């Protein structure tokens, strides 16, 4: 998207919880980034919404509580256990570290025995 002055405008997104949905979202951004505006795209209803194209979306921050994800680049963390989303795109190094988010409501019942909680900011 461009402003009235012709400058490129990026839509900045923060990811809270680097689970399977986040993995699919990040992979989707990488996969569809270079698609043509009017091309039919399997898996994506519209490449442009509200004047923003998929290529205009950039991730600026990411947060999780898992020791396997905190401190890693988001491109690596989306593949960490227990994520098991189908891998459909190669995500380049993003330069977005996953930060420790607060465990406000605890780990989910099914994750408690499967995920080591990060000690950072506990």
Residue ranges of model-derived segments:
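N-terminal glycine-/serine-/threonine-rich beta1-alpha1-beta2 phosphate-ribose binding loop
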Residues: 2-122
């Amino acid at each position: 998207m461009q402003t009235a002055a012709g400058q490129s405008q990026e839509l900045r997104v923060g990811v809270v919880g680097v689970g399977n949905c986040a993995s699919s979202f990040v992979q989707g951004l990488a996969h569809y980034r270079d698609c043509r505006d009017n091309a039919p795209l399997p898996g994506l209803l519209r490449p442009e919404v509200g004047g923003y194209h998929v290529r205009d979306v950039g991730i600026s921050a990411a947060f999780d509580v898992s020791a396997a994800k905190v401190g890693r680049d988001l491109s690596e963390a989306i593949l960490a256990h227990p994520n098991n989303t189908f891998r459909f795109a190669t995500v380049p190094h993003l330069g977005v570290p996953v930060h420790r988010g607060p465990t406000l409501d605890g780990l989910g019942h099914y994750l408690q025995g499967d995920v080591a909680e990060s000690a950072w900011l506990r």
